[in-house]
Every structure is written in structure tokens, then in C-alpha cells.
């Protein structure tokens, strides 16, 4: 598989994630060295959902991120293209909806805030996905995007690149039910826009005031923006 076939069709991506659903959460904890829970908490704090607000958690997977967002008292719905992932999170008591990030099954101006964590890379046309998220968000509403990015310390960046190339695939073979998905993960991270490039893409696709905070030396970048009022 060359470059993890980064031009996969949406159905292929969904099928790939269907196969990892049952072990997805534990695999992410292992591969992130336990940082995933902290990243979810910081995403919730940045989005700052309020009691009574409606929040869309796109590419929610097993809804572990939706569960974290729900701690705020907001009404949070998990939306994902992979039925297998949603099924794997069936025990989590949050609303779940199957949906394509390029054609969201919600009316205009439905949500007070929208977030997507580690899923924007997997939307075939991620700029269309950003516009769709803006469409379903109320004027003045908020966006938070947590996504793997480029480490800001050069030496650490070299170590991280080696981790993605040499260590992540064999670890995934041990802990994941579908190691191919994590080869795709590594390749898609390396091909992803840098922090400033993603901020520019957010600003030209229905949002404004895009900025970011680097987490764990920039392994993850937490972008935020608002929809024009």
C-alpha cells in the first residue's frame, strides 16, 4: 500500500475503521502513551460547551470524546461515517447518528458548537467538511479541531517521525485488530498540512479568527475558530 492510499474513497475509509472499532480506544491509549485522555479534556475546555447548548462531535468514533464533552451539561451528539465505530461505543449514553462529513444530516444553524478530533484528515475533501460544519453551526458558534500535526521542536520532530515510521506499525500489529489502519494513520499524519496552513484553510471555509495551541510539543494541534455572526 503506497502512502497508505491517501486517496481512499469514503467507503474504503469507513470500512477500514469498521474493522478497528472494538479495540480502538485501548489502541489509541497505548499508541499515545496515555495522552489521549488529556487531549480530550483540553479539547472540551477549548470548545467550552455550556449547559443547554447543542454540540456536534463529528468523527466521534466510539463516542468516548462525546462522553467527555457531555460532562459540561451540553447536549452532545456523536456523528461518524463508520457504523462499526458507533456500534463499538453502544454502551456510551449519548445520541449517535451515522453521517458523512461532506453531507451532514443536520439542518442549517443547528448547533452552538462543533468539534472534530483526529477525523478531519479522513474526510475526502476536508475543506468541504469545514464548510459543512460551518453550515450546521449557528452564527457566532464555535469550532474546535484536534488533529495530529507537526512537532515544533526539531529534535523531537525527528524522534516522532521515527516513531511513526518504525515503531507505530509493529505496536499496532500487537494491539490493533487492523494494523493497516494505523499504517494509514502514520502516512496521513505526514501528509497533513502544518498548523498555519490548517488555520488558513479554516478561515477560508466558513470560519474566522482561527488560531491554535500546540499540545505535547505539537504532536497534536488544537485549532479553534468562530462562525461569523
Swiss-Prot record:
Pfam families: Ubie_methyltran (PF01209). GO terms for molecular function: demethylmenaquinone methyltransferase activity. It catalyses: a 2-demethylmenaquinol + S-adenosyl-L-methionine = a menaquinol + S-adenosyl-L-homocysteine + H(+). It comes from the Bacteria. It is an enzyme of class 2 (transferase). Pathway: Quinol/quinone metabolism; menaquinone biosynthesis; menaquinol from 1,4-dihydroxy-2-naphthoate: step 2/2. InterPro entries: SAM-dependent_MTases_sf, UbiE/COQ5_MeTrFase, UbiE/COQ5_MeTrFase_CS. Its EC number is 2.1.1.163. Keywords: Menaquinone biosynthesis, Methyltransferase, S-adenosyl-L-methionine, Transferase. One of its GO terms (biological process) is methylation. SUPFAM superfamilies: S-adenosyl-L-methionine-dependent methyltransferases. S-adenosyl-L-methionine binds at residues 62, 80, 100-101, 117. HAMAP family: MenG_UbiE_methyltr. Belongs to the class I-like SAM-binding methyltransferase superfamily. MenG/UbiE family. Methyltransferase required for the conversion of demethylmenaquinol (DMKH2) to menaquinol (MKH2). This is Demethylmenaquinone methyltransferase. It comes from Corynebacterium aurimucosum (strain ATCC 700975 / DSM 44827 / CIP 107346 / CN-1).
